[in-house]
């Protein structure tokens, strides 16, 4: 008689998302800066854009940032499907590089793209030369030393932008590398303000300014408020600093 094989069982772990705590965290963020670009990169930090986006839209959020084009298109599709009255009122920016074959799709879907070096600028302009308008965010490296134009490239960048007829600059932004280092943070802010002033002196039109991510927002409160705060981890209850900020946990594991 054939023996029965042992069965192996998987232990299922459920992740519960507390949407009320997302709302509470948003309130804490908006106590410092009312205008928020909600970062939904990495599928809303692993919690799922499908689950998180409706909560944020229902709380009045209308500006979102993603790492990649696929996530941005997903947001646009959810808005069309579930929030038809919000079509044309929800803005989405992509923080990372977009491949050439996806650029036209991005523009046609109203997705805003980030420019952070000259090679990329020239490539995007060449591919999109026949598009009516290109909405771009310009990222500057003020000390993070990862992505972005350097301060000494600002005037050259402005010269190039001035001859591009179909470009709309949605924002000038940067990112602070270490908010715990007060001296370095102040240096980065000073660089950023010098860059912005060069745009202003050259009468280059742009939309908004943003440099606050979650750590800068909670470390210095409203000291470095610009037009928007660009917030990800704080929305999801992740502490942006070593000290407690009073954010509410958003996820709970159910065994």
Task: Name each model-derived stretch.
Residues 185-255:
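Anionic-ligand-binding alpha/beta catalytic cores of soluble enzymes and soluble regulatory domains
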Residues 20, 118, 143, 214, ...:
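Generic structural motif
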Residues 8-14, 156, 240-250:
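Short aromatic-glycine motifs in intrinsically disordered, low-complexity regions
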Residues 4-32:
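Positively charged, low-complexity intrinsically disordered leader regions
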Residues 9, 13-16, 34-208:
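Active-site-proximal beta-alpha core segment in soluble small-molecule metabolic enzymes
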Residues 17, 47, 146-151, 178, ...:
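Generic structural "secondary-structure junction" signal
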């Amino acid at each position: 008689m054939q023996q029965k094989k042992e069965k192996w069982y998987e232990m299922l772990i459920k992740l519960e998302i507390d949407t009320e705590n997302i709302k509470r965290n948003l309130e804490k963020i908006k106590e410092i800066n009312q205008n928020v670009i909600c970062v939904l990169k990495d599928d809303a930090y692993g919690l799922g854009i499908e689950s998180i986006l409706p909560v944020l839209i229902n709380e009045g959020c209308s500006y979102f940032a993603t790492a990649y084009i696929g996530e941005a298109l997903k947001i646009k599709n959810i808005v069309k499907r579930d929030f038809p009255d919000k079509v044309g009122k929800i803005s989405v920016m992509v923080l990372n590089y977009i491949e050439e074959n996806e650029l036209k799709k991005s523009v046609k879907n109203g997705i805003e793209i980030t420019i952070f070096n000259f090679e990329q600028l020239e490539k995007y302009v060449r591919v999109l030369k026949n598009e009516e308008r290109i909405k771009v965010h310009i990222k500057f490296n003020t000390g993070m030393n990862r992505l972005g134009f350097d301060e000494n490239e600002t005037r050259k960048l402005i010269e190039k932008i001035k001859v591009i007829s179909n470009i709309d600059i949605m924002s000038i932004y940067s990112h602070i590398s270490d908010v715990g280092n007060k001296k370095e943070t102040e240096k980065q802010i000073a660089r950023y303000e010098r860059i912005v002033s060069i745009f202003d002196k050259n009468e280059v039109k742009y939309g908004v300014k943003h440099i606050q991510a979650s750590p800068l927002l909670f470390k210095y409160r409203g000291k470095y408020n610009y037009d928007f705060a660009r917030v990800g981890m704080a929305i999801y209850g992740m502490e942006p600093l070593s000290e407690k900020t009073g954010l509410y946990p958003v996820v709970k594991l159910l065994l």
